[in-house]
Amino acid sequence: MTCQTYNLFVLSVIMIYYGHTASSLNLVQLQDDIDKLKADFNSSHSDVADGGPIIVEKLKNWTERNEKRIILSQIVSMYLEMLENTDKSKPHIKHISEELYTLKNNLPDGVKKVKDIMDLAKLRMNDLRIQRKAANELFSVLQKLVDPPSSKRKRSQSQRKCNC
């Protein structure tokens, strides 16, 4: 319950962060609804501050816009899961859930990306078969690191050609 109550603050941050891009969000109403949700969870309880933030800290490590969209997709999914266990008959919970679903539909599906990262972390790099496959793929991986994406390459080439 402590994690859930503190997460409500992060929910506010996410809603506000996407508020400037999603014109349909009514931030004043959402803030009021989130305040009601905080009251539902008694988030003013002293244990909420214990241990510091649990989600906002994770966002600091994700600096690029596309990276943030991946992690925010996961965070929005967590909030939707949290709200599944609440009284959906309350108008403020229903409204927050609807807005989160709208945001989720506008974010990339981060689940597959997270699964890919987890799968990579599980690879046993001391296994000879895995080492053979990895060695076989190393040059391709390095090429992806060195080569700029084709759209950036085309744009930079056209900028170099122009003698304006």
From Swiss-Prot:
InterPro entries: 4_helix_cytokine-like_core, Interferon_gamma. GO terms for cellular component: extracellular space. One of its GO terms (biological process) is macrophage activation. Keywords: Antiviral defense, Cytokine, Glycoprotein, Growth regulation, Secreted, Signal. It comes from the Eukaryota. The keyword Glycoprotein applies. Transmembrane segments: none annotated. It is found in: Secreted. Glycans are attached at residues 42, 61. PANTHER family: INTERFERON GAMMA (PTHR11419:SF0). This is Interferon gamma.
